[in-house]
């Protein structure tokens, strides 16, 4: 019990969406970010995520991995990732913003050296969002990259 208490204390904010798989992805990525001196903020306003769990986990895993990697590449003094998730009518909206080097949002490709083995994350997000009858937009402004994903039920 003592060890569990220490783990809960170490994780400054535990995410609860009502979907344990989604919660696990967000909490694990948050713990990783915090352990690399990246502030990780959650603004979750859903009680249950009744959408395709595998699809949402694929989207979140890739988007949060991209956000962490972008933060690690920047020289900014304060690095952060903010994830917001809420429902509006029959839509699930996911917004992620993070510190980033400049990005051409019209040409999102990998910045890694081994390009053939990378760059699949954004393509996976695109395909998964489309398969869930949704859409997404990306924006870069003054040191911050953001992605907004809208999924229809």
Predicted segments, located by residue:
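Short beta-to-alpha transition helix within the HATPase_c
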Residues: 2-6, 10, 18-34
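Conserved short strand/loop->alpha-helix "switch" segment adjacent to the catalytic nucleotide/phosphoryl-transfer site
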Residues: 14, 40-60
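Conserved ATP-binding N-box helix of the HATPase_c
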Residues: 53-76
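Short beta-strand/loop element within the Bergerat-fold HATPase_c
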Residues: 78-90
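Glycine-rich/acidic phosphate-handling loop/turn and adjacent ATP-lid/helix
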Residues: 90-120
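Glycine-rich nucleotide-binding loop
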Residues: 102, 141-148
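Glycine-rich ATP-binding loops of the HATPase_c
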Residues: 132-143
């Amino acid at each position: 019990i003592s060890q569990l208490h220490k783990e809960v204390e170490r994780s400054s904010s535990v995410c609860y969406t009502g979907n344990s798989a989604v919660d696990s992805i967000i909490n694990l990525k948050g713990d990783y970010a915090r352990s690399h001196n990246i502030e990780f903020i959650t603004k979750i306003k859903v009680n249950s995520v009744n959408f395709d769990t595998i699809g949402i986990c694929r989207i979140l895993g890739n988007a949060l991995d991209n956000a962490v990697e972008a933060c690690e590449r920047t020289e900014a003094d304060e690095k952060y990732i903010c994830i917001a998730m809420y429902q509006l009518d029959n839509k699930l909206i996911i917004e992620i913003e993070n510190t980033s080097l400049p990005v051409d949002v019209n040409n999102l490709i990998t910045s890694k050296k081994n390009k053939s083995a990378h760059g699949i994350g954004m393509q996976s997000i695109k395909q998964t969002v489309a398969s869930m009858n949704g859409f997404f937009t990306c924006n870069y402004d003054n040191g911050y990259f953001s992605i907004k994903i809208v999924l229809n039920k």
